[in-house]
């Protein structure tokens, strides 16, 4: 294996691990872990819900997640293309949120399916998100 191929493989592995850490950070309410996948100046666009910094998105979504009984973020197909110290990825994500019981003892399950379209860069010895666009392909309430 060439050095370039090995470097690309290591980059893809680091990026995939970061995607997993992001989901785990949100699901386990570990804010530092969720922050860790973003560069300080990273930006985020979550369809019509949020536009701003990556850390700002984590802060914004924290309030929503804290008000839910449970939440689950699961990633699936992930295509990562590395170009030197930058990369792009498209990752399918399923997000399931369960509301707390309402006064009638009912609970809602919110399911969203979409894609993370990420721009990554390698800075200060780590791969992190420079920009993310979340595309919501469908959402259902049960």
Mark where each language-model region is.
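A solvent-exposed, acidic/Ser-Thr-rich amphipathic alpha-helical stretch
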Residues: 31-96
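Short, surface-exposed coil-to-beta transition loops
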Residues: 73-75, 111-116
């Amino acid at each position: 294996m060439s050095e370039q191929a090995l470097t690309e493989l290591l980059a893809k592995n680091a990026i995939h691990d970061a995607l997993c850490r992001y989901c785990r950070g949100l699901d386990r309410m570990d804010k530092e872990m969720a922050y860790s996948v973003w560069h300080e100046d990273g930006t985020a666009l979550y369809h019509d819900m949020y536009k701003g910094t990556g850390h700002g998105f984590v802060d914004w979504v924290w309030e929503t997640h804290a008000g839910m009984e449970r939440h689950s973020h699961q990633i699936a197909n992930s295509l990562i293309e590395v170009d030197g110290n930058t990369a792009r990825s498209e990752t399918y994500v399923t997000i399931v949120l369960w509301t707390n019981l309402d006064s009638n003892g009912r609970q809602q399950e919110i399911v969203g399916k979409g894609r993370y379209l990420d721009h990554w860069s390698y800075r200060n010895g780590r791969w992190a998100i420079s920009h993310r666009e979340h595309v919501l392909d469908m959402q259902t309430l049960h």
